[in-house]
UniProtKB/Swiss-Prot annotation:
It comes from the Eukaryota. Residues 476-485, 500-509 have a biased composition (Low complexity). Keywords: Coiled coil, Isopeptide bond, Nucleus, Phosphoprotein, Transcription, Transcription regulation, Ubl conjugation, Wnt signaling pathway. This is RNA polymerase II-associated factor 1 homolog. InterPro entries: RNA_pol_II-assoc_Paf1. The keyword Amino-acid biosynthesis does not apply. It comes from Pongo abelii.
């Protein structure tokens, strides 16, 4: 073979193969890009995860008032496309004895899907979450036609278990049967645990609503940490926290916060004396409480969105178990001290008990009626009494003569007609005001929660009247209220406070402390005078 001559340029080209000569990628941007850095590669392979939640949860549409008030024009035919024969009413009468066509009978039959009992198909439909699929595009169906997508492997809750556990009653008969079954199940004796066969009951007690304490609204108070004082522990700390009180206050800048008050030693002695004498409180005694902590508060009640119902149980020996409702949930978080703002650590709460007023008694009657599932019907009771009186009067008139009978019958007829008219008016007013009552109940509940924490104007007016009476009755400068003074003078404020107890113990108070969070609830209607330096 003849020799060949290779130049220097050909040698350099030989070391650079043609496969490495790539043209620059064409950009999809029309204008010239100054910085054309390409995106980095994805660090991991894509994962096809099923999104278990509703995709419309973040884009819920809410119509404005302008759209709601706009009236669209409906251009339709006079008969709306339905020709009605007003002359012959038998035209649309249905004959119940007519036999349906076989094709129509099939359409009316309910579709019942028979469960597949093939063991091979069940084994084939199993999903192994740790095994990776070898195909990029999967139809999620196998040759047996059973879906390979299991809700149990989805992120979130088990959707399949949620639907299988809920029994859906489609007709009225099934609902009645289910309700009757609950009464039959309640009569059966409990021999073992519903899910643990080896667990047997030690004692079986009936569960009833707490008719005695339901009239008092209870609140659940959740602390971010243990509110017990650092210098005490054990039984002494539990005793102090069981008698603690929370009260809404306001600092110099006008910011509201919740103060946590603990009883002083003298108050503990008085409460112990009252317990030994089997009395709730001494009418003439004054109980002092000192401030221990300051908290920011967050209140949720039935009117709040996303509120979950909460109940607590009271065990009474020899009587049974009673449950009550916690209609308000208060979360307290520690309040940070601000620079230049005077702290209320020297505040003193003076508590003096009083009898409930008419407004509070009416609220208790309303809660009792709510538990009994009906509202107090005072008007109906008065009507029944008047009818009985009229019936008694008519008997006497029958003995006297026939003329009085005629007059009494006419009066009764006129009275019954007026009662019917009044009943119709009451029903119409109840229907028209049902929507307003629901909204007013939510607003009243929110206002009552704020009133229980921060007090009300009506209580302050009542307290001012009681101050005038105390000044007129005081002799020798003696007073039940104690003031705390400072070098520059003290500020004195009086207010009424109401606090309720969610205690399952007969003593009337409960407090449970934990490391991460503790819950407390406070009981009883009281009059509180707060003196702060």
């Amino acid at each position: 073979m003849a020799p060949t001559i290779q130049t220097q340029a050909q040698r350099e080209d030989g070391h650079r193969p043609n496969s490495h000569r790539t043209l620059p990628e064409r950009s999809g941007v029309v204008c010239r890009v100054k910085y054309c850095n390409s995106l980095p590669d994805i660090p991991f392979d894509p994962k096809f995860i099923t999104y278990p939640f509703d995709q419309n949860r973040f884009v819920q549409y809410k119509a404005t008032s302008l759209e709601k008030q706009h009236k669209h024009d409906l251009l339709t035919e006079p008969d709306l496309g339905v020709t009605i024969d007003l002359i012959n009413p038998d035209t649309y009468r249905i004959d119940p004895n007519v036999l349906l066509d076989p094709a129509d009978e099939k359409l009316l039959e309910e579709e019942i899907q028979a469960p597949t009992s093939s063991k091979r198909s069940q084994q084939h439909a199993k999903v192994v979450p740790w095994m990776r699929k070898t195909e990029y595009i999967s139809t999620e169906f196998n040759r047996y036609g059973i879906s390979n997508e299991k809700p149990e492997v989805k992120i979130g809750v088990s959707v399949k278990q949620q639907f299988t556990e809920e029994e859906i009653y489609k007709d009225r008969d099934s609902q009645i049967t289910a309700i009757e079954k609950t009464f039959e199940d309640a009569q059966k004796s409990i021999s073992q645990h519903y899910s643990k066969p080896r667990v047997t009951p030690v004692e079986v007690m009936p569960v009833f609503p707490d008719f005695k304490m339901w009239i008092n609204p209870c609140a659940q108070v959740i602390f971010d940490s243990d509110p017990a004082p650092k210098d005490t522990s054990g039984a002494a700390a539990l005793e102090m926290m069981s008698q603690a009180m929370i009260r809404g206050m306001m600092d110099e800048e006008g910011n509201q916060f919740v103060a946590y008050f603990l009883p002083v030693e003298e108050t503990l002695k008085k409460r112990k004396r009252d317990q030994e004498e089997e009395m709730d409180y001494a009418p003439d005694d004054v109980y002092d409480y000192k401030i221990a902590r300051e908290y920011n508060w967050n209140v949720k009640n039935k009117a709040s969105k996303g509120y979950e119902e909460n109940y607590f149980f009271i065990f009474r020996e020899g009587d049974g178990v009673y449950y009550n409702e916690l209609e308000t949930r208060v979360r307290l978080s520690k309040r940070r001290a601000k620079a230049g703002v005077q702290s209320g650590t020297n505040a003193l709460l003076v508590v003096k008990h009083r009898d409930m007023n008419e407004k509070e008694l009416e609220a208790q009657e309303a809660r009792k009626a709510q538990l009994e599932n009906h509202e107090p019907e005072e008007e109906e009771e008065e009507e029944m009494e008047t009818e009985e009186k009229e019936a008694g009067g008519s008997d006497e008139e029958q003995e006297k003569g026939s003329s009085s009978e005629k007059e009494g019958s006419e009066d009764e007829r006129s009275g019954s007609e007026s009662e019917r008219e009044e009943g119709d008016r009451d029903e119409a007013s109840d229907k028209s005001g049902s929507g307003e009552d629901e909204s007013s109940e939510d607003e009243a509940r929110a206002a009552r929660d704020k009133e229980e924490i921060f007090g009300s104007d009506a209580d302050s007016e009542d307290d001012a009247d009681s101050d005038d009476e105390d000044r007129g009755q005081a002799q020798g400068g003696s007073d039940n209220d104690s003031d705390s003074g400072s070098n520059g003078g003290g500020q004195r404020s009086r207010s009424h406070s109401r606090s309720r107890s969610a205690s399952p113990f007969p003593s009337g108070s409960e407090h449970s402390a934990q490391e991460d969070g503790s819950e407390a609830a406070a009981p009883d209607s009281s009059e509180a005078d707060s003196d702060s330096d």
